[in-house]
Structures are given as C-alpha cells and as structure tokens.
C-alpha cells in the first residue's frame, strides 16, 4: 500500500520519476483561491444535505480559510512538496490541521469535477479582468477617434498610398475590431458559466448532492446536466484561447502600424520617452519596444491555442491525463493578454501624432484619383473608361512631376 490518497489498491510506491513526471503543483498552484472557494461551498452543501454536521462543516470551512491566508502570505513553497497537484496539496494541509475530519472534504467529489470547477472559476475571474481591460482600450480608442476626426492622413492598401482618410477613422476601425472581441468574450462567458461540480469522475454520485444549490452559490447560471460532458471537455478553455488569439491579432496589427509610423521614413508618430528604449551601442536610437513585444507575444498565444486543440482532438470520453496539459498554455495565454492590454492603452495615450505631415501626405501622391474617377462616372462616363482615363492622366502627371489637380487645371 502506498501513502497516496488513491493508493489503497496499490502494493508498490510510485516511482519517484513518475511522481515528478505526473505532478502539476508547480504550475496549477495558481488555482488555490478557486479551489478553496469550491471546497468551501462543497462542504456547506454536504452539511445542508446532512452528510456532514454543521460543526464539521464549520471546522473544515474555517481551516480552509486559514490555508488560503497562509498561501497568500507565502508560507509554502510549491516546488518543494510531494503532493501531485493543488487539490491534493490543500487537502493534505487540511488533514494536518484538523486530522481525520479533513479526510471528509472530498466526500461526493472527484478531482475530475473539482479541477473542471476550478478552471471554470479561474477563467471566469480572468475573463472579467480581460473584459475590463478591453473596455478601457475601447474607451481610449473612442477618445482618439473624437480627437482626430478632422485630421487627414493617407489610407493604405498593400502598404501603398490609396485614398485620404482621417486619423479618427483609423482609430475607429480598431475600436470596432476590439468591440467585436469584447462581444466574443461576453458570448463565451454565457456559454462557460455553468457548474460541473457533482459530476464526480464521470457518472455523478449516489450521495444526495444538490448540484443546483452549489451552482447558484458559486455564481453560475446553472449546472452542466450531462456528467460525462461536465468532466471531459475543455471547449471553454479552447474558446477563451481562441478569443485571446483574436485579440492578440488585432493588437499585433495595430502595433505594426505604430512601429512603421514611428520610423524616420514615415515620421507620423513620436514615441514618448517613458514608453521607448535606447540602444546599447547607437546613441541615436529610440526603439518601439512596447509595440514590438506585443506583436511578438501574439505568436505564443497562437501556439497555445494550437497546443490545446491538438491535446483534445483524439481523447475518448471521459477524463484523460492528457487534459493536465491544458493548464500551462491557458495560464500563459491569460497572463500574456492581460499584460499586453495593460500596456497598450497608456502607450496609445502617450503618443504624439504628426498631423500636419499626415495632412500633407494625404493631399499629395494622387490620392484624389478615385474621387476624380467617380466624378467622371457621375457625368455619364462608363466606369472602365473613366478608370482608364484617370490612369492615363496620372501617368502624364508623374512624367510632368505635378499633381493631378495641377495637370487638370493646366489642361
């Protein structure tokens, strides 16, 4: 018999290398707050259903709160423990504090529904924070839209000057993109906010559990009715990672423009000293590290999305140990998108835009060609003929080194 909580049927101790390979405490300890919240509601339910006494419930509840405080105060080193994961870590601390009563905590529960609950609570908490940060970014873009609604600049396709737009319209485009991202995040929240607790390992429990009461107590919209589904899917993790990848894609595109605009060749934007870095060799340099890092970090978020999709694609129902691999990528995705959103808003607010140069560029370079084409169409000329005619005028203007308006007025 081993000293593991699940070791009753085993005659040999777990090989130390397997124990180390199997462990996830070094990274899943970030779930401690959610794990304790879930356990506290679970024991209150056990008392409500007369499976535990009120006195037992209160003693377990209070001891769990003490453990939460001790973890927050840094009293434990997660890298020096033998427990497999944060769930076993907290349970063992509980048993050390209150003895055999602590062994009743896991009554009516499996780690399968326990970890599914913890992940839903964790992603819900972090999803709310991401939503708040998105709102701040959208508000910032709205301010920039209003501030620059009259400031002309060149619009680009293929990174070539195309038609005049306003700087305000540019920022409004990203405001629209991030608003859709916010909508996606809120849609995800509606789908994921259901409780798996009470699903057990895969087939529920013979104990008279009240799953609906637990769900309501933890702020869920309801329960996941199918217990197999409750413990076996991580689509809510995948969907959050997908939304995060979309947000990072939009952030990366925004940053790409700002990086280009900050070059001497464009000179559309000046970086604030507080949000730029220098070179260890070249004293003339002022580098856009903030947007470059955000652009670069998009790759790791994409990678984590592909990783969890690949982990899940071939798993039979219900739970499999493969699913432990959902966490590190999820945690890094969340941490990455939070820090990027925290940086981008003050970075945008710090920028100085060279609007006179933008206007000059918008009024040169034949950006008025499409408007002239359409004026010919309005006079009755077929579109293709008008397109050909304006193209010929542009070729002539380039040869004469004058603007299109100057050419037409001279003609």
From Swiss-Prot:
InterPro entries: Arg_succ_lyase_C, Argininosuccinate_lyase, Fumarase/histidase_N, Fumarate_lyase_CS, Fumarate_lyase_fam, Fumarate_lyase_N, L-Aspartase-like. It comes from the Bacteria. GO terms for molecular function: argininosuccinate lyase activity. It holds the Pfam family Lyase_1. It is found in: Cytoplasm. It catalyses: 2-(N(omega)-L-arginino)succinate = fumarate + L-arginine. Its EC number is 4.3.2.1. Pathway: Amino-acid biosynthesis; L-arginine biosynthesis; L-arginine from L-ornithine and carbamoyl phosphate: step 3/3. CDD domains: Argininosuccinate_lyase (cd01359). Its main location: cytoplasm. The keyword Acetylation does not apply. It is an enzyme of class 4 (lyase). GO terms for biological process: arginine biosynthetic process via ornithine; L-arginine biosynthetic process. GO terms for cellular component: cytosol. The keyword rRNA-binding does not apply. HAMAP family: Arg_succ_lyase (MF_00006). Belongs to the lyase 1 family. Argininosuccinate lyase subfamily. NCBIfam families: argH. This is Argininosuccinate lyase.
């Amino acid at each position: 018999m081993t000293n593991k909580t699940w070791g009753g049927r085993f005659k040999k101790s777990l090989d130390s290398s397997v124990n180390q390979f199997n462990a996830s405490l070094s990274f899943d300890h970030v779930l401690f707050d959610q794990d304790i919240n879930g356990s506290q509601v679970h024991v209150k339910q056990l008392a409500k259903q007369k499976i535990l006494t009120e006195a037992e419930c209160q003693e377990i509840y209070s001891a769990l709160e003490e453990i939460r405080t001790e973890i927050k105060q840094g009293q434990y080193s997660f890298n020096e423990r033998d427990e497999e994961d944060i769930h076993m870590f907290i349970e063992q601390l509980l048993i050390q504090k209150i003895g055999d009563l602590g062994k009743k905590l896991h009554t009516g529960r499996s780690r399968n529904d326990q970890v599914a609950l913890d992940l839903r609570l964790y992603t819900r908490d972090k999803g709310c924070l991401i939503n708040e940060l998105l709102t701040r970014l959208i508000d910032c873009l709205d301010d920039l839209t209003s501030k620059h609604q009259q400031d002309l600049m060149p619009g680009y396709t293929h990174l070539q000057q195309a038609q005049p737009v306003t700087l305000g319209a540019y920022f409004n485009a990203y405001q629209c993109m991030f608003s859709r991202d916010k909508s996606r995040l809120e849609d995800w929240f509606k789908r994921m906010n259901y409780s798996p607790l009470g699903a057990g390992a895969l087939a529920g429990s013979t104990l008279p559990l009240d799953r609906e009461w637990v769900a309501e107590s933890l702020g869920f919209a309801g329960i996941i009715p199918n217990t197999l589904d409750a413990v076996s899917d991580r689509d809510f993790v995948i969907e959050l990672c997908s939304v995060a990848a979309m947000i990072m894609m939009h952030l990366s595109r925004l940053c790409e423009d700002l990086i280009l605009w900050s070059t001497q060749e464009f000179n559309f934007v000046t970086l604030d000293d507080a949000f730029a870095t220098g070179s260890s060799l070249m004293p003339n340099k002022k580098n856009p590290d903030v947007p470059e890092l955000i652009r670069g970090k998009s790759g790791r978020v994409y990678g984590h999305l592909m990783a969890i999709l690949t982990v899940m694609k071939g798993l039979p129902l219900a739970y499999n140990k493969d699913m432990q691999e959902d966490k590190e990528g999820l945690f890094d995705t969340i941490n990455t998108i939070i820090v990027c959103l925290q940086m981008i808003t003050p970075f945008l607010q710090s920028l100085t835009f060279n609007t006179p140069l933008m206007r000059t560029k918008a009024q040169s370079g034949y950006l008025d060609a499409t408007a002239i084409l359409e004026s010919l169409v309005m006079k009755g000329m077929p579109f293709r003929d008008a397109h050909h005619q304006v193209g010929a005028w542009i070729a002539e203007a380039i040869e004469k080194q004058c603007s299109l308006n100057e050419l037409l007025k001279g003609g």
